[in-house]
């Protein structure tokens, strides 16, 4: 769960899966899978993947605010 939080936050900061994956030294598909796992756990998408750069969904905004509080 901790890695998922770290990965979601990196994608949020970079607004890009590719840039976040490079920053984290992992493959983009692995990062995408971890974010999908986090989304499954909360039951909702975190990112709107139809926009460039990525934007947060309403649930994603709440998730990121929660992460910021615990970091």
Residue spans for each PLM region:
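Hydrophobic residues on short alpha-helical segments
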Residues: 5-12, 57, 64
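A structural signal for alpha-helical segments
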Residues: 26, 55-58
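Alpha-helical linker/hinge and terminal dimerization helices associated
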Residues: 5, 41-42, 63-71
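Short, basic-rich loop-to-helix N-cap that marks the start of a DNA-contacting helix
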Residues: 1-3
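Core residues of bacterial helix-turn-helix
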Residues: 23-24, 35, 42, 63
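A short LG(V/I)-centered, amphipathic sequence patch enriched
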Residues: 39-56
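Short helix-boundary/capping micro-motifs
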Residues: 9-27
């Amino acid at each position: 769960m901790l890695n998922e939080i770290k990965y979601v936050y990196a994608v949020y900061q970079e607004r890009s899966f590719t840039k976040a994956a490079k920053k984290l030294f992992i493959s983009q598909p692995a990062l995408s899978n971890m974010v999908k796992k986090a989304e499954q756990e909360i039951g909702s998408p975190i990112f709107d993947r139809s926009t460039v750069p990525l934007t947060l969904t309403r649930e994603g905004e709440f998730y990121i605010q929660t992460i910021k509080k615990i970091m």
